[in-house]
Amino acid sequence: MSSSNQNLAIAANAIDITAPESTIPNKSKVPNKSAESSQSTVPKAPSRREIRAQAQAFIDTLAPLQHTNSQKVYLEGSSADIRVGMRQILQTDTLVGGTDDAPIMEKNPPIRVYDCAGPYSDPEADINVRLGLVKLRQNWILARKDTEQLPCATSDFTQQRLADDGLDHLRFEAGSSAIVRPRRALQGKRVSQLHYARQGIITPEMEYVAIRENMALAEVQDEILNRKAKGEAFGALVGEPITAEFVRAEVARGRAIIPLNINHPEAEPMIIGRNFLVKVNANIGNSAVTSSIEEEVEKLVWSTRWGADTVMDLSTGRYIHETREWIIRNSPVPIGTVPIYQALEKVNGVAEDLTWEVFRDTLIEQAEQGVDYFTIHAGVLLRYVPMTAKRVTGIVSRGGSIMAKWCLSHHKENFLYSHFREICELCVAYDVSLSLGDGMRPGSIADANDAAQFAELETLGELVKIAWEYDVQTIIEGPGHIPMQLIKENMDKQLAHCGEAPFYTLGPQITDIAPGYDHFTSGIGAAMIAWYGCAMLCYVTPKEHLGLPNKQDVKQGLIAYKIAAHAADVAKGHPSAQIRDNALAKARFEFRWEDQYNLGLDPETARAYHDESLPQESAKVAHFCSMCGPKFCSMKITQDVRAYAAGLEAAQTKAEQVEAAAQAMQVTIKTPQELEAAMALKSAQFAASGAEIYQVIDKHVKDKLVAEAEEA
């Protein structure tokens, strides 16, 4: 899933990941331009050289990094090699009574949350990007005995790259003679998770997914944490804990996919489907003018830290092949690509010169490297292109426009459509999933839900059924720019035409008036369509339609989309979704500031915002914030509640005290004048008692109040 400028494409000129120190700028040699820019109020952007140096330093010093007060924990499955990593957020205790010298504290349980960072959040992990991550799934793949290791890569292009000595300094495992040898299904075998699921086999990957989706729900015993409102799932099957059998059944039905190429054993199993947690994709990649391999590895790690469930490498520069190898070997999440981008590079950017042979070799090249899913724009048919003529924004999908131009220049049917069965045969040999691209998606709300968009959607529905014939896991891509009132129609039509295959959308963006804030405008649409049933959301950054995003833009886009995905999970009634909300709400009510930060999606920003206005250490435990101050904080009533509870007589229950107080207030009012007098009396009594909302009422006070009320 990509947009015309969403490619995080950031540089590719000569990208030596093992570059000598001389390639990193020496601060003493950098000209001092402060005098020249002293009048400017705009901070000077770092140079390309500085950005690359920063990225080089990042990967040279890369070590596991965990959020404050969080731990990496593992839950074991049925065998010791099924270890599912999660992030455990530790909480502080709650004050429930006692005195300053002898406080009575109540333990708050740790909260376990989904963790996309893999080894990058495990302090015990040994991280070395030049060696790649541990091959988590290697033994599972070998145990099935349905694949073979090839003597060498079979792609013509890969062989050409390997024969080019000038690229040695760029290769993964640079300086080593070791070459990653790909695997492929044995002749006549199918090795997809869909194939196994249809055979009734629960794979280790399926068991892993079930444990991961539940997030240790069974261990949560706290009544407050387990509270949740009834969800509205629009026909989705949520609300019960996930089992491995349920995962198998959903994959077998085609309603979910587990995108895991057999040549990407480093990836941790995850699932995409509307009956599971909503997932978020982030885009990275180099281009002909910006970025380096170092930067792309840095962005990969950064994206997983902030919650990217999958990452798409949308590289378009000279070193696509080498960049992708580094990314895959260091990625704990599935990697997707748009193969037509690289195929276009191979024909020097001339769409008319594309051929099936060039594209097929590109698929083999990427499948043997370990790409987990391909976006294929096979639904852009020749007869659909004229339907876009009256659009405000025409064809905005890069892949869609490439194939539209090819179709028109040759006046032939899209070769991706014509050769779709061959594509499926190739994919199932590596368990590469297909993401059927929406080349006709609208690029403005003025073009939403038009004939071209829905004609392509119907074709994608035909193609998904063909893919299922070959046991190829498949998802459907969707828009785009859709106003709020038209979003549900998109989801309904996708479910109807595509057999409930998972939906994967870019947004949708619900208005076109906010450049610079499209992570908001699209995040709203993303939350809505995810609630209606969309399984995965492709993030949008603040730079959408404006430029290439930097690291902070990537973080902003991911946070916006994690909010959208989580909001949909809560609305659908996913069994474990609301636990984190409840924990944070309880921490907020109890003024446990550090827990509030740590339970949030972005602890760093939350902490910084609080400290910006109240930086003193005492403010870290204060029972107010700068919004209302100590006198007007609505949540300060928690102190009154505690005082009320502590002052109750030991012989009586809280319920008895409330009932006694209620009975004491029952007086007979006969006239408006009596009512006014009684209200005035109660006002005076409230002020005289200290003007506290919650007060202790013992028997003597009760009797006095009753007497005063009767006298009045």
From Swiss-Prot:
Q: What is its EC number?
A: 4.1.99.17
Question: Coiled-coil intervals in this record?
Answer: none
Record carries keyword S-adenosyl-L-methionine = yes
Pathway assignment reads: Cofactor biosynthesis; thiamine diphosphate biosynthesis
* Free-text cofactor note: Binds 1 [4Fe-4S] cluster per subunit. The cluster is coordinated with 3 cysteines and an exchangeable S-adenosyl-L-methionine.
* Feature: compositional bias, Polar residues: 20-42
Positions bound to substrate: 283, 312, 341, 377, 397-399, 438-441, 477, 504
- Catalytic function, reaction form: 5-amino-1-(5-phospho-beta-D-ribosyl)imidazole + S-adenosyl-L-methionine = 4-amino-2-methyl-5-(phosphooxymethyl)pyrimidine + CO + 5'-deoxyadenosine + formate + L-methionine + 3 H(+)
- Where are the annotated segments for Disordered? 14-49
Write out the residues that bind Zn(2+): 481, 545
Keywords attached to this entry: 4Fe-4S, Iron, Iron-sulfur, Lyase, Metal-binding, S-adenosyl-L-methionine, Thiamine biosynthesis, Zinc
| Any Pfam family hit | ThiC-associated
Chain residues that bind [4Fe-4S] cluster:
625, 628, 633
Q: Which cofactor does it need?
A: [4Fe-4S] cluster
Report the record's Gene Ontology biological process terms.
Answer: thiamine biosynthetic process; thiamine diphosphate biosynthetic process
Superkingdom of the source? Answer: Bacteria
Extract one GO molecular function annotation from the record: 4 iron, 4 sulfur cluster binding
* A GO CC term attached to the entry: cytosol
Write out the similarity annotation: Belongs to the ThiC family.
Q: Which PANTHER family match?
A: PHOSPHOMETHYLPYRIMIDINE SYNTHASE, CHLOROPLASTIC, THIAMINE BIOSYNTHESIS PROTEIN THIC
Assembly mode: Homodimer.
Q: What is the recorded function of this protein according to its Swiss-Prot or TrEMBL entry?
A: Catalyzes the synthesis of the hydroxymethylpyrimidine phosphate (HMP-P) moiety of thiamine from aminoimidazole ribotide (AIR) in a radical S-adenosyl-L-methionine (SAM)-dependent reaction.
Specify the protein name. Answer: Phosphomethylpyrimidine synthase
| Originating organism | Shewanella putrefaciens (strain CN-32 / ATCC BAA-453)
